[in-house]
């Protein structure tokens, strides 16, 4: 692939790691963010200490606070901003774009209020005149491992297989590999909802439960993610792939996962506001729990784990009681998909 110019919007942990992957592949990478001190640090010290204490970035990676400069004459734009500001940033990009680009996103969440997936937001806010079909970059990936060039396999999903293949070539190298998929609904739904299950898995650990319980919540969590995804139009096979069970395993079993750590703290009795303050990073699983619960209620989809987490976070229920209540639910077949 010839050298591409790529704007990465969002210099958080994942945005920074993906910027490094793209830089390793010989592309011109421009990181954009709105925290002046952070951008200056990346440009002068070539570090991003808030997220990576011992990592030095390549000096060729340039960071910007001016969005217009960051996206000027680029071939593609990668959104890696929190769900809650995706629409705002997309509006800003739409007002500045002067040529057609490939639009990608690597965030995982659902918009509160509208319940929309992030690709839908980008489609709504950026005119088709200035963009490709949206490409979703998602899968089992800790930024802490990708940044040290550990082997990582994820998915590039788009309704346009040509766009997905472009992104596959853009990122893939000897340690980072992408597989294509056309099931955007499934890939995005899996990526968003696994954060809820990760909160639950962390809570089980914080409460002192063992591996049996953790395996149970991951597998039954996958079942309810699939139930909702299929109801929304996803291909059930997607949930057995990298962006489904793969992402659920890595997020639901690792201390690298901020959602798992948040759940662990909840299980140990910490208050949510203290957890969010101490972590200093966005915990997408918290807001996604509310959105997923509302969607499930509207569509009458059985999601007991999501409901238990919702009641604990938003209704003040005791997390242990909420989990134990599931043990007295009506008996069901393992293969019920409704």
From Swiss-Prot:
Gene3D superfamilies the UniProt entry points to: N-(1-d-carboxylethyl)-l-norvaline Dehydrogenase, domain 2, NAD(P)-binding Rossmann-like Domain
Annotated EC: 1.1.1.94
Active site: 194
Keyword list, A-Z: Cytoplasm, Lipid biosynthesis, Lipid metabolism, NAD, NADP, Nucleotide-binding, Oxidoreductase, Phospholipid biosynthesis, Phospholipid metabolism
Annotated pathway: Membrane lipid metabolism; glycerophospholipid metabolism
Pfam families: NAD_Gly3P_dh_C (PF07479), NAD_Gly3P_dh_N (PF01210)
Compartment list: Cytoplasm
Domain of life of the native organism: Bacteria
Location (main, coarse): cytoplasm
The reaction(s) this protein catalyses: sn-glycerol 3-phosphate + NAD(+) = dihydroxyacetone phosphate + NADH + H(+); sn-glycerol 3-phosphate + NADP(+) = dihydroxyacetone phosphate + NADPH + H(+)
InterPro entries in the record: 6-PGluconate_DH-like_C_sf (IPR008927), 6PGD_dom2 (IPR013328), G3P_DH_NAD-dep (IPR006168), G3P_DH_NAD-dep_C (IPR006109), G3P_DH_NAD-dep_N (IPR011128), NAD(P)-bd_dom_sf (IPR036291)
Protein family per UniProt: Belongs to the NAD-dependent glycerol-3-phosphate dehydrogenase family.
PANTHER family xref list: GLYCEROL-3-PHOSPHATE DEHYDROGENASE, GLYCEROL-3-PHOSPHATE DEHYDROGENASE [NAD(+)] 2, CHLOROPLASTIC
Listed name of the protein: Glycerol-3-phosphate dehydrogenase [NAD(P)+]
Record lineage: Bacteria, Bacillati, Bacillota, Bacilli, Lactobacillales
Gene: gpsA
